[in-house]
Amino acid sequence: MGRLDGKVIVLSAAAQGIGRAAAIAFAKEGAQVIATDVNEMKLKELEAYKGIQTRVLDVTKKDQIENLCKEIDRIDVLFNVAGFVHHGTILDCTEADWDFTMNVNVRSMYFMIKTFLPKMLAQKSGNIINMSSVASSIKGVVNRCVYSTSKAAVIGLTKSVASDFIDQGIRCNCICPGTVDTPSLRERIQARPDPEQALKDFLARQRTGRMATAEEVAHLCVYLASDESAYVTGNEHIIDGGWSL
């Protein structure tokens, strides 16, 4: 018996990083996973795992989300993972940077939740998990202005949905990681003028002396997706190795 036996889980940004680790962890616990991403080539790799189907999806496109929803008869868990990290202060952030970040990090969740929530309400049960960050309303982080703003909005969205539908069988929580060692992070480090120093800077702020792994975050994802967390809603779940202390 798996902890997620029989549950249908839809998640975004599943091709790599936390999304990929979560998709694999969900499937290993018995869930039927519909893994989505814009990266078709990387996404296809997940089809090697029993219990995982894949769909190419751009979460900023409302029509694509609606078409996916029509394909699915039932959904137990919606996990919104897709996100973009902009580096810089408010003075480094152009209007285009602002709009792109907000579209990927917040508007996509608005689209996903608004599309799939009616199906959950009809079932009288549903579980929504949103990916936020410690870099949000939890902690001010240097050079994360628009990113932190967007992730603070995710916390607000999470609490609002949880409050509005708590008496209709709906739960909504968000996950707030600190620094996680993912392909996305490694790409950002390599894009810096001095990648070696950038890596040292990331490690220096880790009170545990290391970054989290995507698999460690996936353990929390499994808990929140399972009935073990049935009494948990409207919360931001911090997993940051003590960075926010």
Swiss-Prot record:
Keyword flag Lipid metabolism: yes
A cellular component term, taken from the record's GO annotations: cytoplasm
Question: Which cysteines are disulphide-bonded?
Answer: none
Query: Where are the coiled-coil regions?
Result: none
The protein's UniProt keywords, in alphabetical order, are: Cytoplasm, Lipid metabolism, NAD, Oxidoreductase
* PROSITE patterns the UniProt entry points to: ADH_SHORT
Query: A Pfam family matched by this chain, by name?
Result: adh_short_C2
Entry-linked CDD domains: DHRS6_like_SDR_c
Compartments it resides in: Cytoplasm
Q: Which residues form the active site?
A: 147
Q: Which InterPro entries match?
A: NAD(P)-bd_dom_sf, Sc_DH/Rdtase_CS, SDR_fam, SDR_superfamily_enzyme
Question: Which protein family is it in?
Answer: Belongs to the short-chain dehydrogenases/reductases (SDR) family.
- Can you state the subunit structure given in the record? Homotetramer.
Task: Tell me the PANTHER family matching this sequence.
Answer: DEHYDROGENASE_REDUCTASE SDR FAMILY MEMBER 6, DIHYDROANTICAPSIN 7-DEHYDROGENASE
Its protein name is Dehydrogenase/reductase SDR family member 6
Q: Which organism is it from?
A: Xenopus laevis
